[in-house]
Amino acid sequence: MSNYYYYYGGGRYDWLKTVEPTNFLKIGLPYQAHPLHLQHQATTTPPSILEKFKRADILLNEVKAEMDPLMLQPETEKKLYQILGSIDMFKGLRKKVEFTYNAQIVTNAWLKMYELLNTMNFNNTSQAFCNCELPGGFISAINHFNYTMMHYPTFNWVASSLYPSSETDALEDHYGLYQCNPDNWLMQSPLLKKNVDYNDGDVTIASNVKNLALRATQRLTPIHLYTADGGINVGHDYNKQEELNLKLHFGQALTGLLSLSKGGNMILKHYTLNHAFTLSLICVFSHFFEELYITKPTSSRPTNSETYIVGKNRLRLFTPKEEQILLKRLEFFNDTPLVDLSLYQNLLESIYFAVETIHLKQQIEFLNFGMKCYRHFYNKIKLLNEYLAPKKKIFQDRWRVLNKLYVLEKKHKLKLCAPQGSVA
């Protein structure tokens, strides 16, 4: 944990001193050398294996539930989000990064990806496939890192996302990255539905996943880095966030495992890690990467459940049988485990340590802190911001130093053409 605390002298707000900003959390998982046996059909998992994960889910949801009544009224919901925004240590950092370092599309996703790249020490970032990618924060961060830190002469990329339309919750092309770089994108407009190989980027569809992986490898070989930042909007139902995203997260992972080259690295977004299917998916990953980690960047808000699974140095590709089984499971999806979890006791212990560290300790601590701030600063948000401003500056300056930011030369900037009415 960081040595930087909130200090505001004595008085009624001394309790603000008790919360400290987070450090990058990284929990290593053991490689599994034994053969991978994928389950063709559902089998019963002994309850004892999942018991503590279920308890962890209950404990976290009990804390989250304190906020549920506030979500029911527009006024209290607005105040809650204002408070949570005030305790976000990275609020305001995006503009500083954009203007100081000539960076592009500096979203929260940009900060997280840059931090992941800098902390995880990847050996190659020059050729990347970024999935579930719009509006483009990951690509922009990789581009910036590639040229300013890795000093490669080129950055080659392909990307995909659920095609933005009024009929879906897909993120839009706010910055014109898709509009100005159509040849880099793998998904297609609904206007092309008549095409035999039409693909709208929906990774919950097995045929799309297989097709996206094929397109990616045809356009870019080798693929050194695969990223996926998919997440379904669950409204206010955060207690079911992991469950509602199971199929999406399986699809984005499968796309990566079908396309990532040997020796490549992978970064996948997840939320809580308590569901038996999620645990089994991590078990599958452990057969393919020399190093596997569950991470929580400091720029990922500590009040949310977001995690990133990182695989380093892919050791082998799928066998035809493994590919067939996993694609069939996605096509006829059910959430039973992909493997026999009883064979992975040591790995599950490491995963639980990550759950305990990220969710049961850090997230619960910050959720409780957020609720306490809500009670004390409901009508004094300006005062809360004044209290936190000095330490935000210290922490943001520290983050910029730790993550070694440098100015991106103009010649290396991505081509953007933000459409009318965008947020660029």
Swiss-Prot record:
> Where is this gene product found?
Virion
Q: What is its main location?
A: virion
Q: Report any Pfam family annotated for this entry.
A: FtsJ
Taxonomic lineage of the native organism: Viruses, Varidnaviria, Bamfordvirae, Nucleocytoviricota, Pokkesviricetes
Adrift-type SAM-dependent 2'-O-MTase domain: residues covered: 104-316
User: Catalytic center at which residues?
Assistant: 269
Q: Name one GO biological process term.
A: methylation
* GO MF entries: mRNA (nucleoside-2'-O-)-methyltransferase activity
State the name under which the record lists this protein: Probable methyltransferase EP424R
Top-rank EC class of the record's enzyme? transferase
Q: What induces it?
A: Expressed in the early phase of the viral replicative cycle.
What is the species of this protein?
Answer: African swine fever virus (strain Badajoz 1971 Vero-adapted)
Give the EC number(s) under which this enzyme is classified: 2.1.1.-
